[in-house]
UniProtKB/Swiss-Prot annotation:
Changing residue 511 to C: In NDNC1; also found in a patient with neural tube defects; the mutant protein localizes to the lysosomes compared to wild-type. This is Frizzled-6. Belongs to the G-protein coupled receptor Fz/Smo family. Gene3D superfamilies: Frizzled cysteine-rich domain (1.10.2000.10), Rhodopsin 7-helix transmembrane proteins (1.20.1070.10). The lineage of its organism: Eukaryota, Metazoa, Chordata, Craniata, Vertebrata. Pfam families: Frizzled, Fz. GO terms for molecular function: G protein-coupled receptor activity; ubiquitin protein ligase binding; Wnt receptor activity; Wnt-protein binding. SUPFAM superfamilies: Frizzled cysteine-rich domain. It comes from Homo sapiens. The keyword Signal applies. GO terms for biological process: canonical Wnt signaling pathway; cell proliferation in midbrain; embryonic nail plate morphogenesis; establishment of body hair planar orientation; hair follicle development; inner ear morphogenesis; midbrain morphogenesis; negative regulation of canonical Wnt signaling pathway. It is found in: Membrane; Cell membrane; Cell surface; Apical cell membrane.
Length: 706
């Protein structure tokens, strides 16, 4: 007998795991410590040999207890997992009647949560027990019958986070009001093919907007002095939206790698959206995107302020520029302050449609106070100042209505302001409409999503009377389009003929040759043109009258200063007055805009000196041929009158050296050096002096018209 007792002890002692041999023990499970009994016995019906194990297994049924699907659910669970122990080894299991009542009340929630009902707790296996252990029932349930049961199950119990969407503690995740829960990734509203189309669309629009805004900024760099206040904020505004476009393009390239967390099979976690500032890449994208989005809007408001100061308050450009420090402080300081606040509040959210990170994508309060409210405020202030400025400009236009030229310029300026403002305000107001529509319908969309996936995720399905509503993909595409296309309005302001001229000049300067050789080439081409022109006239004109008018063409090559002063001379070319210069010829010989006005004023004084130089040095080929043709027509007897005419004009003409020298030097074009240095950039000025020789029979003198 003693041997048998010893064997039983050896068999059952390892199973007791520290418990007293067949004795009751105090209840340590917190949820069951409020029961009418305080002692329990282990192992229980499910074979648990420790209260800690029983407490862990009991957690699978906690949704039923938390939702109170039955008034006796707590009593039944505690009696099943932590049974009652009376008088040492007398264990009281749950009764069959209690099991049937609880199971019938909670059957729908058991199916909803996918809870596996243990075989040991099947009501058929339990025994009917006496009334020594009271079973509490809800009197309303007994009175109302099955109607009350249906009402209890169908009441709205809120959102329960699915197991694969739960996150580890300490990250600050919150989804649909539930802590440590994250939205699913990819997007919870759209299918995979719709998401691919939306991402391609956003990437294409971002490239187009990036090119447009960069064109505006590069135009500013070509000629910085062109864009002064009040127009200067347009440049900063375009820079901001170029960064915004760049962020969306980077998000398009990255896909979901930054906006989503990868699934963890070990922890049974699925792909979820990044929430909070723990992800560094997502945080950087958020900071740049939100900061420059708000900064671009503030710079537009500052642009309307500068326009109002210039048009309404009649401030000068210099006066407005003095306030530039304050403009920069507000434009960069306000978005920076809002960005820091959002980082401190841990409001960073991944966007699994565009691939970037922003704010207010799942948090309605953050979207309302940090996106919608600032944009509405900027639109209101900017539109008010813009209307005030346009009214002031219209008043000025009425005052100067007698000045047609200035009135036309002012009218064009007002049209530019109106079109530019419309190109900015229409997309921005549309964007605000998208945000407002999303604010109103977001809750309905979320309830619909929970209702569609509750059985798949084994979570409670919401009870609702409203019709289901799902968002349209077109709404989100319009929102992204309006966000990006706002920056394109700056292209309209810089898009003018002057901008094309500046870009053409920029590329031309990059390919420009040596300025000195360039000026010489222009001079040589001009002289060759006159030489060819006069040779044609020589064959056509057989009769020459000495009284015919002549044009004295003086070509002066202006060099370019490249560290040392470059001096170039002048050459004189005589053309008969019969050789009429057409519009194209005048265009070719027209002086450059950089010609010094001092030479034009000193034209009368410099002409005699140039003529003396022309007579004292070898003549140009065109001049020699012109004079030679004149002598052949008039004969040797008229040479004296020509020389007398030359003396009356203040120059000395050689008699016999003209022909010889001209023929000898016909192949050499010599340009005498000018006494006045020039620093103009490769320009060639051609000064045309009409000289009329009116022959008088008696005096043989010459009358000159200059």
């Amino acid at each position: 007998m003693e041997m048998f007792t010893f064997l039983l002890t050896c068999i059952f002692l390892p199973l007791l795991r520290g418990h007293s041999l067949f004795t009751c023990e105090p209840i340590t499970v917190p949820r069951c410590m409020k029961m009418a009994y305080n002692m329990t016995f282990f192992p229980n019906l499910m074979g648990h040999y420790d209260q800690s194990i029983a407490a862990v297994e009991m957690e699978h049924f906690l949704p039923l207890a938390n939702l109170e699907c039955s008034p006796n659910i707590e009593t039944f669970l505690c009696k099943a997992f932590v049974p009652t122990c009376i008088e040492q080894i007398h264990v009281v299991p749950p009764c069959r009647k209690l099991c049937e009542k609880v199971y019938s009340d909670c059957k729908k929630l058991i199916d909803t949560f996918g809870i596996r009902w243990p075989e040991e707790l099947e009501c058929d296996r339990l025994q009917y027990c006496d009334e020594t252990v009271p079973v509490t029932f809800d009197p309303h349930t007994e009175f109302l019958g099955p109607q009350k049961k249906t009402e209890q199950v169908q009441r709205d119990i809120g959102f329960w986070c699915p197991r694969h969407l739960k996150t580890s503690g300490g990250q600050g995740y919150k989804f649909l009001g539930i802590d440590q829960c994250a939205p699913p990734c990819p997007n919870m509203y759209f299918k995979s093919d719709e998401l691919e189309f939306a991402k391609s669309f956003i990437g294409t629009v971002s490239i187009f907007c990036l090119c447009a805004t960069l064109f505006t900024f590069l135009t500013f760099l070509i000629d910085v002095r062109r864009f002064r206040y009040p127009e200067r904020p347009i440049i900063y505004y375009s820079v901001c939206y170029s960064i915004v476009s760049l962020m969306y393009f980077i998000g398009f390239l990255l896909g979901d790698s930054t906006a989503c967390n990868k699934a963890d099979e070990k922890l049974e976690l699925g792909d979820t959206v990044v929430l909070g500032s723990q992800n560094k890449a997502c945080t950087v994208l958020f900071m740049l995107l939100y900061f420059f989005t708000m900064a671009g809007t503030v710079w537009w408001v500052i642009l309307t302020i500068t326009w109002f100061l210039a048009a309404g308050r009649k401030w000068s450009c210099e006066a407005i520029e003095q306030k530039a420090v304050w403009f920069h402080a507000v434009a960069w300081g306000t978005p920076g302050f809002l960005t820091v606040m959002l980082l401190a509040m841990n409001k960073v959210e991944g966007d699994n449609i565009s691939g970037v990170c922003f704010v207010g994508l799942y948090d309605l309060d953050a979207s309302r106070y940090f996106v919608l409210l600032p944009l509405c405020l900027c639109v209101f202030v900017g539109l008010s100042l813009l209307l005030a400025g346009i009214i002031s400009l219209n008043h000025v236009r009425q005052v100067i209505q007698h000045d047609g030229r200035n009135q036309e310029k002012l009218k064009k300026f007002m049209i530019r302001i109106g079109v530019f403002s419309g190109l900015y305000l229409v997309p921005l107001v549309t964007l605000l409409g998208c945000y407002v529509y999303e604010q109103v319908n977001r809750i309905t969309w979320e309830i619909t999503w929970v209702s569609d996936h509750c059985r798949q995720y084994h979570i409670p399905c919401p009870y609702q009377a409203k019709a289901k509503a799902r968002p349209e993909l077109a709404l989100f595409m319009i929102k992204y389009l309006m966000t990006l296309i706002v920056g394109i309005s700056a292209v309209f302001w810089v898009g003018s003929k002057k901008t094309c001229t500046e870009w053409a000049g920029f590329f031309k300067r990059n390919r420009k040759r040596d300025p000195i050789s360039e000026s010489r080439r222009v001079l040589q081409e001009s002289c060759e043109f006159f030489l060819k022109h006069n040779s044609k006239v020589k064959h056509k004109k057989k009769h020459y009258k000495p009284s015919s008018h002549k044009l004295k063409v003086i070509s002066k090559s202006m060099g370019t200063s490249t560290g040392a002063t470059a001096n170039h001379g002048t050459s004189a070319v005589a053309i008969t007055s019969h050789d009429y210069l057409g519009q194209e010829t005048l265009t070719e010989i027209q002086t450059s805009p950089e010609t010094s006005m001092r030479e034009v004023k000193a034209d009368g004084a410099s002409t005699p000196r140039l003529r003396e130089q022309d007579c004292g040095e070898p003549a140009s080929p065109a001049a020699s041929i012109s004079r030679l043709s004149g002598e052949q027509v008039d004969g040797k007897g008229q040479a004296g009158s020509v020389s007398e005419s030359a003396r009356s004009e203040g120059r000395i003409s050689p008699k016999s050296d003209i022909t010889d020298t001209g023929l000898a030097q016909s192949n050499n074009l010599q340009v005498p050096s000018s006494s006045e240095p020039s620093s103009l950039k490769g320009s060639t000025s051609l000064l045309v002096h009409p000289v009329s020789g009116v022959r008088k029979e008696q005096g043989g003198g010459c009358h000159s018209d200059t």
